[in-house]
From Swiss-Prot:
<feature type="region of interest" description="Disordered">
    <location>
        <begin position="611"/>
        <end position="644"/>
    </location>
</feature>
<dbReference type="GO" id="GO:0016236">
    <property type="term" value="P:macroautophagy"/>
</dbReference>
<feature type="modified residue" description="Phosphoserine">
    <location>
        <position position="860"/>
    </location>
</feature>
<dbReference type="GO" id="GO:0005764">
    <property type="term" value="C:lysosome"/>
</dbReference>
<dbReference type="Pfam" id="PF16158">
    <property type="entry name" value="N_BRCA1_IG"/>
</dbReference>
<dbReference type="GO" id="GO:0032872">
    <property type="term" value="P:regulation of stress-activated MAPK cascade"/>
</dbReference>
<keyword id="KW-0479">Metal-binding</keyword>
<feature type="modified residue" description="Phosphoserine">
    <location>
        <position position="591"/>
    </location>
</feature>
<dbReference type="InterPro" id="IPR000433">
    <property type="entry name" value="Znf_ZZ"/>
</dbReference>
<keyword id="KW-0458">Lysosome</keyword>
<dbReference type="GO" id="GO:0000407">
    <property type="term" value="C:phagophore assembly site"/>
</dbReference>
<feature type="modified residue" description="Phosphoserine">
    <location>
        <position position="626"/>
    </location>
</feature>
<dbReference type="GO" id="GO:0005776">
    <property type="term" value="C:autophagosome"/>
</dbReference>
<dbReference type="InterPro" id="IPR034852">
    <property type="entry name" value="PB1_NBR1"/>
</dbReference>
<feature type="region of interest" description="ATG8 family proteins-binding">
    <location>
        <begin position="745"/>
        <end position="756"/>
    </location>
</feature>
<dbReference type="InterPro" id="IPR053793">
    <property type="entry name" value="PB1-like"/>
</dbReference>
<feature type="binding site">
    <location>
        <position position="241"/>
    </location>
    <ligand>
        <name>Zn(2+) 1</name>
    </ligand>
</feature>
Amino acid sequence: MEPQVTLNVTFKNETQSFLVSDPENTTWADVEAMVKVSFDLNTIQIKYLDEENEEISINSQGEYEEALKMANIKQGNQLQMQVHEGYHVVDEALPKNVVENQAAARTGKKPLAHYSSLVRVLGSDMKTTEEPAPEQCSSAPCDTDQPQDKPPDWFTSYLEMFREQVVKETVEKLEQRLQEKLVLQKPLLSSSPTEVSMPISEETLFLPENQFSWHIACSHCQKRIVGVRYQCSLCPSYNICEDCEAGPYTHDTNHVLLKLRRPVVISSEPFFYSKYSAPRLPAALEQVRLQKQVDKNFVKAEKQRLRAEKKQRKAEVKELKKQLKLHRKIHLWNSIHGLQSPKSPLGRPESLLQSNTLMLPLQPCAPVMPTLSAAFVDENLPDGTHLQPGTKFIKHWRMKNTGNVKWNTDTKLKFMWGNLTLASTEKKDVLVPCLKAGHVGVVSVEFIAPTLEGTYTSHWRLSHKGQQFGPRVWCSIIVDPFPSSESPDNVEGDRISSSKADDFSCEQEEAFLLAEEEIPLGEVTKQTEGTGASASQKTRRAASERELYIPSVDLLTAQDLLSFELLDINIVQELERVPHNTPVDMTPCMSPLPHDSPLIEKPGLGQIQEESEGAGFKAPPDSTVSAKRKAETPASVEETEEDLSGTQFVCETVIRSLTLDAAPDHNPPCRQRSPQRELQLYSTEGQQPLVLPGFCRKDSSLKFALPEEGPRGDEREEIVHIVEEEVVEEEEEVQDEEVQSQSSASSEDYIIILPECFDTSRPLGDSMYSSALSQPGLERGAEGEPGIESGLEPTEARERLPERESQPQEQSISDILTTSQPLDTVPLVPEVAGLPAALSRSAPCGQCESSGVDSPGVDSPATMHEVPPAPDDIRGEPRGSTGLANSRQRSCDHSRHHNGSSIAGGLVKGALSVAASAYKALFSGPPVTAQPIVSEDQTTALMAHLFEMGFCDRQLNLRLLRKHNYNILQVVTELLQVNNNDWYSHRY
């Protein structure tokens, strides 16, 4: 069943809707009857609108069915219909042709063939349904005088327009056909030139000779043009005949002549040849047509030209944008082939816009900014070269200028850090050869091998007016031990020279450089270019200077060195093997370590201390402790012979990351035993010592170097000593050899450079950071003048322990940290918690203060220095032995029972603690203090810290605080273990 269709019928702005079904149930006669009744009409003409909004008449059942199908398919069951009042139903007595003519006259369209039969059917239906209407219609004569018989105005106007159009088209068609026949029948006749001005009648207008007669005189021969005519496209008044065009004629040869065979008759205008002069009409029409054609061609050509110019302009703009984008990202380029001299003005991207020619993509772009860059090519002394003590040597680095700025006297090789002694201490930077861009030269530095055996390095980097650039280069050597056949005099002489080298300040000698001749690029076999960029290294100069772009190669920031992978002890062995002066993209984060000489003695304090600090300490003139040293015998050297452990590597990495901005230290390693019983501290004027708890043992002496907090030139100095606990000279004399063997075999020395976030204005016990591996300690009364021996018997130290402290003897430490302060400070007695059972690498409460690694043994002195960056302001203490066990200290009985595995475990924990503490200090801000809490306010503060960290079980937190003697580090560790166990049990 077909869907129903809604008929929207409109008659004189009145619309009614009819709902019809399929054509079988509702026929066209029914629809027409409904429309007549609805609008009270007698005779109607119904039209519907198709999909193109064209009116189509409906006069039969077939047309009605087609309209319904169209409405179902294309118009959504909607059919728009228009009703026009008319007379298509007439009396049957009239002839059939009369009815058809009347219908055609009223509708304006030719009736269909079946219209007569339809009229009969509809007429009979209308007579049966509406009897009065047919009678009235039949009785009324078809007279146009009556008002009801007069057609509507729109119909009358339409017929008038239609009549005019038909007449005009008919006349034009007849004229065209007549002209064609005349042309084909009669030949062309010649005419005289005098006929140009003769009037032409209508009869002679269509003659063949006049058809091709232009009634225009030839501009060359002055004859009337008959036949083909040539007209200039630029000069409308210049016309020549076909004969003159074939021969020579006087006209501009650049002008194009248009060939015209016959005039074109415009059908829209009737030809009234009697009213117009015959010669002018065709010429004027042809001229207009030609002018329009010329204008059209010109406009078309102009549009094409403009379109081509627009396309070319777009291509130019696109290319310029591409080049500007490349200039903005010039820091990603390794080098620029378009070189620019230093004195030339700075190239700007705006200069590219001044070019009118389209730049090809392969054309090299001018550099946007002068770039400073360098690449390491070769060296003369590879890493790990063995040298004898005191040997003078010159280290050469072959460097290539990969930038576009020539190196001048402002370009120098600047010292960064290291412990290798220079030949002169006057300057810490050396001149480099004035290399042009792309050339290779030799940079040289003169060194002196230290007198003590060990591994020594010195790191350097190129600098231009204070801005560093290029890769970092270094010199790494291994100093062999003294031969056993050396006399004591030679040893003593080397000891004195080493002692002098220990007192060097950070000033280096400006060595002479051996500049090489300019080497072409093709001869360079090794080349490494920097690819990174650092916007922070751009410096603004004066108006006469330019802004130089310096690509960063090795920034050596603490964030880079303290990444998460450095905290993983599993990768330590992989990082121990470091190539010799590797290229830029493989530059290690630390000094090269020896891996090709297994018989080298463990560097210990020597390498770590010298590479970490990088600048020596000058001894005060009022020092009363002499820097006397003893050279070790070959037997003691063999006892302490070890490879550099992974723990030392991690510690050294962390240490260097924290001391990058601090002044370097140049003290050579000191591995000799000191006969002194203690180290004496000389503080500045007006400073009072403060006693603080110690947390380091003998075998791992610590040296803390704090960055300067005050302004440059601050003379304040904070030195912390950890001195021995028990001193009994008689017992030490008896056990001297025993301590020697133990300390030389198990001692490892560390220097921890405290970060800037460490609070040096307060004593170490009051600081907001605490050690992650600290031990319970006691205060010792050591306030007094410097140089006075301060110590307590072990029994006194144990008596002063709190009652709740019941730690084993091997975890007990009662060292003394003596801090010099500018004001008198009341001694504090803080307690340091015991060593945690296990330290997780992911502990959330890392501590910032770096501590020493717990090793069984007797206490050893450690010194804390505050290092100003200026070499002139650096002060220190004379130290005769740094990092070795004091031969006069007492050894505990239990220390003999610990093997090397326990020491290694302690070292691993210490290294991880140092790394985690430094990482948390740099990235996590000030952590929670780990001081034991006794008061209720302090307990509340610790509970609040635990709440902030996410541990909200108050009873569990309080119980664990009491269990661990208010050591928040151990509390957090156990809470994390509990949470992990709970998660694991619920997860699995």
